[in-house]
């Protein structure tokens, strides 16, 4: 939002917490959003240049039945609801950008390189992302609005993203790779998430899935070694995979597995 405002765009933010959001983004117009039902916010998509839909419950927690339902609802159902709002707009938006995830590809062997044409993987997260993207594509199929699905990797950056959680053990000299450290992390810096999102918003040739990752993925061992070097902390203390699974259940796949995703389309666009 801050980058859009900085370049002179007028931005409306739909949120469930108007007061907090307005305080954080004083230059934006902030409107109350109901994530589970139509409301006055439907009118906000009328005539805009683009809608960027980023809603989604955190997946980094144990997947109880309630958690699974909320992960699905907060992604698929809200995307369908946004599509309903776009369908009712008299002047359709120029584009609909919807967050997605590299979880689309499911857990994969580290040597396999996955671009946007790779098929979906298997498992709970992969199934969620497949249906999430179907809901996003329906906006274009039903309403003729250009749709882009942003398959975002592990986001890092100072003061946000996954980095804070990744470095916490290192501060207490407890850092190291998980398991054998061979699982691949398809990461991206927060600034590049913004850059690729703006590229997709502005470039009318961009539609469909877009891998939002750095071109060079890293193994868990490489990530641990890099964090240790920057913080001047040891990075050799391995965390047993069984311990992670005991604490997180099925959700442990987020940490113990990975996929080597390549941003072929972004590279072809010159990013």
Residue ranges of each PLM-predicted region?
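Conserved beta-loop-beta element that borders a ligand/cofactor-binding pocket
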Residues: 100, 134-158
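Glycine/proline-rich active-site loop of Rossmann-fold NAD(P)-dependent oxidoreductases
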Residues: 145, 156-165, 200-210
């Amino acid at each position: 939002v801050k980058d859009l405002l900085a370049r002179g765009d007028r931005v409306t933010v739909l949120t469930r917490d108007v007061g907090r959001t307005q305080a954080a983004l004083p230059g934006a117009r902030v409107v109350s959003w109901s994530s589970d039902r139509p409301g006055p916010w439907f009118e906000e998509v009328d005539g805009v240049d683009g809608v960027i839909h980023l809603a989604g419950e955190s997946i980094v927690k144990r997947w109880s039945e309630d958690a699974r339902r909320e992960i699905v609802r907060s992604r698929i159902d809200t995307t369908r609801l946004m599509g309903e709002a776009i369908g009712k707009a008299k002047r359709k938006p120029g584009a609909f950008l919807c967050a997605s995830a590299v979880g689309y590809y499911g857990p994969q062997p580290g040597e396999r390189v996955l671009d946007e044409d790779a098929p979906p993987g298997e498992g709970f997260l992969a199934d969620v992302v497949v249906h999430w993207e179907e809901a996003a594509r329906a906006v274009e199929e039903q309403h003729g609005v250009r749709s882009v699905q942003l398959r975002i990797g592990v986001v890092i950056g100072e003061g946000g993203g996954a980095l804070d959680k990744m470095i916490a053990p290192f501060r207490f000299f407890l850092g190291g790779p998980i398991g054998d450290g061979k699982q691949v992390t398809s990461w991206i810096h927060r600034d590049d998430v913004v850059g690729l999102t703006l590229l997709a918003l502005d470039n009318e040739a961009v539609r469909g899935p877009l891998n939002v990752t750095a071109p060079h993925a890293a193994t868990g061992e490489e990530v641990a070694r890099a964090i240790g070097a920057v913080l001047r902390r040891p990075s050799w203390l391995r965390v047993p995979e069984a311990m992670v699974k005991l604490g997180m259940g099925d959700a442990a796949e987020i940490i113990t597995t990975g996929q080597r995703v390549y941003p072929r389309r972004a590279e072809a666009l010159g990013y």
